[in-house]
Regions:
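Aromatic-lined ligand-binding clefts that engage carbohydrates, nucleic acids, or primary amines
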Residues: 683-706, 714, 739
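Aromatic-lined substrate-binding rim segments of carbohydrate-active enzymes
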Residues: 86-154, 158-159, 262-266
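Short strand-turn-strand beta-turns centered on an Asx-Gly dipeptide
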Residues: 65, 564-565, 569, 704-710
């Protein structure tokens, strides 16, 4: 009997052992044997500042004062946002971890009428850049003359069409007007360049030259679109960002034009360390004088929804997205500065962005070798009205007349989204460890290029490493794929020059569905060699002379830290903390350095902002920090919890409150399609804004004040949330805002296009056309000043 039991136990053990051995997935990565070639001195880029600062560019990264940096750029168009709200938006962008704001100068807005330039109000370019300087925010000015930006004629003035000349060419007549434009821009920028101690570090020349164009707004219904490009380029000009496989017969002409534009910019005084130009899709570049920037859009409105290749790792420097390209990739760093973590909607195509796509796209892009990451758009806005009537929107493309929300991390009215917080994780990591990451090359596993977007089984991963140290990048997200599942039984084996490193040493880990993570290996933490961690690095702060490293625990992965026993004192070299603010442990190096490590939960990390002085604030509110105070913006909640670390309160949670207010709103639906809204909004110092939230199902909606169309909205399954602050003065007189809605037809073209998830669509089983307005509410956005030096006195311990 005992023998039978023993035999069954052995058999059961064998089955379990074989099962787990079979389900264990070991993924291998080999450190390259050949040295990494970095070229220097060949690019006519770089510059100095009056304080002795120096920016330089080699073939792999940008450096400042001899230190590698990874710029994080976030597009924000000053002319699409109210002047009085610029400062707060710039501070929100800064709190999101963005270090550079690119902004367009739309020619047709500034010279709507020939030779009559405007630089006032929302068009005050100089004031915008001066505010950026005030808050240590750097700027790249995109001077056109052609911009696109879903704006009328791509930014070219209407009157240009009347001139007998070739636009976007070296036609002398065209260059006369461009030179005049550049000279006017130069006057606005004078004294604000990096060389002057100012914030302008870059100028972008043109946009998508010989790749893309916009339709001329002066056209007729049913007419074939006539695009804004030289006649000889019309067969090459695409609509939207995409692959260009045609051989550009006029390539040399395009490159000569780009070089001419750069010379005109320089003559206008625009001297900067960094010049950029569109690099994707076979666009014309400026050889050795500008950095080609690349793009990736996972939810493009100009294409039928499908799984993109932009969640798959690659060597992005040598194989840029939307290849082929027209430049030698060995000679330029990878500047992925137009990443579509949001997208604009057009009438016939309304892609709804999954916020997790933003994090996945950027983990993939950074892991693939990008040494600049940036977003178009990072902050949405609204298209202004033309002084002569009509709108600046690119109406032939079906763009909303006013809304340019773009589903950006910061939306049309300044509200931050989930993607804002997800991206902030990556930006904080770059702020603290970008100097280590930038020189690291990308290393890919065998067979990486055979993985298809629809593959749900094979781990998607890559490493960036140098001298056996580096970071692992992994993602289990794919856009337009609702059937992914978690990947279990994972183990990474790194075949390094001096060792074979297995992560984890024992057991396996699971990568949750839609997760994207970055894990360090062989990283020195102030003298202690961290062999690996199954936790993601977030920040490094100095605390009373000690180094404190902040990690986050990815969902579904138990944090484990393994140190090299030769570099730390004591017997303990492995740590398994439970994630949270109470997880801090310490160790000492052989050299006597004290190191602290705290592992936050992912949710705590998502809510973490690193302040200008390096401290961390953990809160669900939006953080706005200027030179003198820190303010928390809270939508609908007058009480907020927060932690500031380090501080005299340690990791203890604090709470701050302001007086609650209950704004009154009355709404009446009239005649089926009309809605009249009257609101009573008290002006209070602790109210930042009021947001009118309209829950409806329909096709399009328009808002009017005193007969003027002031806003519009394309329905896409989510409520319309409107800032009322910008209409305060007008509403004091009119007292009401009127809306007009059009019903949604079951055969609407955007439904057939498939951009809106099925679960968001209404039930058409009972009727073919639906218009429902279920609720209208007015939500206050509170501003809670917690100060900095005296924050403990203004709050109470919770």
């Amino acid at each position: 009997m005992n023998r039978i039991v023993l035999r069954n136990i052995i058999l059961l053990f064998s089955i379990v052992y074989c099962h787990f051995g079979w389900t264990q997935n070991i993924y291998k990565l080999n450190e390259p044997i050949t040295p990494h070639q970095v070229h220097q001195g060949h690019l006519k880029l770089g510059g100095s500042s009056p304080d002795g600062g120096r920016m330089e560019v080699n073939s792999f990264y940008v450096s400042e004062n001899g230190q590698p940096i990874i710029p994080v750029t976030g597009e924000f168009h000053f002319s699409r946002y109210p002047e009085k709200e610029w400062e707060q938006s710039i501070l929100k962008i800064k709190s999101g971890g963005v270090t550079v704001i690119p902004t367009y100068v739309f020619w047709n807005m500034h010279e709507e009428n020939e030779n009559q330039f405007r630089w006032d109000g929302n068009l005050n370019l100089r004031k915008f850049i001066e505010i950026c300087r005030q808050h240590d925010m750097r700027v790249i000015v995109r001077i056109g003359p052609f911009c696109h930006g879903e704006i009328r004629n791509g930014g070219l003035p209407d009157w240009i069409l009347a001139k007998p000349m070739e636009v976007r060419s070296n036609d002398d007549k065209y260059l006369f007007y461009v030179k005049r434009l550049y000279n006017e821009i130069g006057k606005q920028l004078n004294g604000l360049y990096y060389k002057d101690g100012g914030p302008i570090i870059g100028i972008q020349i043109e946009n998508e030259h010989q790749h893309s164009a916009a339709p001329w707004a002066l056209n007729y219904p049913g007419e074939a679109k006539d695009n804004t490009c030289a006649t000889y380029d019309k067969e090459f000009a695409l609509v939207g960002v995409s692959i260009q496989n045609k051989e550009i017969a006029t390539a040399k002409i395009g490159e000569e034009h780009m070089l001419t534009l750069k010379r005109l910019a320089e003559e206008a005084g625009m001297i900067v360390p960094l010049y950029t130009a569109t690099g994707w899709g076979n666009a014309a570049i400026i050889g050795n004088e500008a950095i080609p920037v690349t793009a990736a859009y996972t939810y493009p409105f100009w294409e039928k929804p499908s799984m993109s290749p932009f969640c798959l790792f690659k060597d992005i420097q040598h194989n840029p997205d939307y290849s082929p390209v027209r430049y030698n990739t060995d000679l330029y760093p990878s500047f992925c500065a137009e990443m579509g973590v949001g997208i604009q909607m057009i009438y016939e195509s309304r892609p709804v962005i999954d916020p997790r796509a933003a994090e996945a796209l950027m983990v993939r892009t950074l892991g693939s070798g990008a040494n600049c990451i940036g977003y178009y758009m990072y902050h949405g806005g609204s298209n202004p009205r033309r002084t002569g009537g009509g709108f600046y929107a690119d109406e032939p493309m079906g763009i909303p007349k006013i809304s340019y929300d773009y589903q950006a991390p910061i939306g049309e009215f300044g509200l931050t989204s989930e993607s804002y917080k997800y991206l902030r994780l990556i930006h904080t990591f770059i702020r603290n460890f970008g100097n280590k990451l930038a020189p690291m090359r990308t290393v890919l596993p065998e067979g990486y290029d055979s993985i298809s977007p629809s593959n749900r089984e094979t781990l998607r991963f890559a490493a960036r490493m140098k001298d056996g140290s580096g970071f692992l990048f992994m993602t289990n997200f794919q856009d337009h794929d609702t059937n992914r599942h978690k990947q279990e039984g994972l183990k990474i084996e790194l075949n390094l020059k001096n060792e074979i490193l297995t992560i984890p040493e024992k057991g396996t880990f699971t990568l949750e569905k839609d997760a994207s993570i970055i894990l360090p290996f062989n990283m020195y933490l102030n003298g202690a060699r961290l062999k690996y961690a199954t936790a993601q690095l977030l920040a490094h702060i100095q605390e009373k002379g000690d180094s404190h490293y902040i990690f986050l625990a990815p969902d579904g992965i138990a944090p484990e830290y393994v140190f090299d026993k030769k570099t730390v004192k004591g017997r303990k070299t492995k740590f398994h903390p439970t994630a949270g603010t109470k997880s801090t442990f310490e160790l000492k190096t052989i050299d006597g350095n004290r190191i602290l490590i705290t592992t936050l939960t992912r949710q705590e990390a998502i809510e973490t902002t690193q302040l200008e002085d390096g401290r961390l604030i953990i809160t669900s509110a939006t953080v706005v920090q200027d030179k003198n105070r820190t303010t928390l913006l809270s939508l609908g909640k007058n009480t907020v919890d927060y932690i500031i670390y380090p501080s005299e309160n340690g990791w203890k949670k604090q709470q701050a409150s302001v007086e609650a207010t209950s704004p009154q709103v009355k709404w009446e639906r009239i005649g089926g399609r009309h809605l009249c809204v009257k609101s009573d909004m008290r002006s209070l110092p602790h109210i930042n804004d009021y947001f009118l939230n309209i829950k409806y199902t329909g096709d399009v909606a328009m808002a009017f004040i005193e007969n003027d169309l002031v806003l519009d909205h394309f329905w896409h399954g989510k409520p319309w949330c409107i800032s009322m602050k910008r209409f305060t003065e007008r509403l004091e007189e009119s007292k009401e805002m009127n809306f007009y809605f059009r019903p949604l037809a079951k055969d609407a073209p955007f439904i057939e296009m498939g951009g809106i998830p099925q679960e968001m669509l209404p039930d058409f089983s009972q009727e073919d056309n639906i218009l429902e307005i279920s609720n209208v509410e007015l939500i206050p956005e509170y501003r809670i000043d917690i100060g900095l030096s005296a924050f403990a006195m203004r709050s109470k311990e919770k």
